[in-house]
């Protein structure tokens, strides 16, 4: 109990969410996880970023790699921590909270997430790795309402990338095929 504010201290859970942005030669896509659940007797299907709560015995970077591997099969992806999201309204939708509590088998109140970002080139090998998972590439303009605040996290990731590329333009070339057109470069 905080004496000045007369409110209880937050009992935060910490999670990691991974924004994996890929370029398939034509457009930018985000790697999302298919999610299904039930709320008030109604079945729902939507999507979310690859993410989960962290374990007590792991570092944030380890958690991000573990979560990405468990949910997508991807290994050794270059992930960069880019922002923390801790709005008290992150868990305002009961559907999200109930889904997470069932998945984690634990009571969840407030969640602070550490967002990670990766830029990858989408190729056959990468897609083959995803075949056995509930993961899918979704073009940026086709992304619908996602779980939690994941739309905001993606928006912030795109802003971060644009600023990052201003100072590190060579990072764009990692996304492009060996031979690329001016149109492909402009798309990025």
Question: Language-model segments: what does each one mean?
Answer:
Residues 111-122, 126-163, 175-187:
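NUDIX/MutT-family hydrolases
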Residues 30, 34-40, 44-46, 79, ...:
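Short, His- and charge-rich active-site/binding loops that engage polyanionic ligands
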């Amino acid at each position: 109990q905080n004496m000045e504010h007369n409110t209880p201290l937050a009992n935060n859970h910490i999670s990691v969410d991974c924004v994996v942005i890929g370029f398939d030669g034509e457009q930018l896509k985000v790697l999302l996880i298919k999610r299904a659940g039930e709320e008030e007797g109604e079945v729902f299907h939507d999507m979310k970023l690859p993410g989960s709560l962290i374990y007590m015995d792991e570092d944030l970077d380890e958690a991000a790699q573990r979560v990405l591997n468990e949910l997508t099969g991807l290994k050794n992806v270059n992930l960069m921590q880019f922002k923390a999201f801790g709005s008290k309204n992150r868990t305002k939708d009961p559907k999200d909270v109930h889904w997470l509590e069932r998945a984690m088998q634990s009571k969840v109140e407030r969640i602070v997430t550490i967002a990670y970002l990766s830029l990858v080139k989408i190729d056959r090998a990468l897609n083959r790795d995803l075949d056995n998972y509930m993961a899918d590439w979704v073009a940026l303009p086709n992304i619908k309402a996602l779980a939690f605040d994941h739309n905001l996290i993606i928006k912030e990731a795109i802003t971060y990338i644009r600023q990052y590329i201003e100072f590190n333009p060579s990072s764009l070339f990692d996304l492009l095929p060996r031979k690329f057109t001016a149109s492909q470069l402009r798309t990025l």
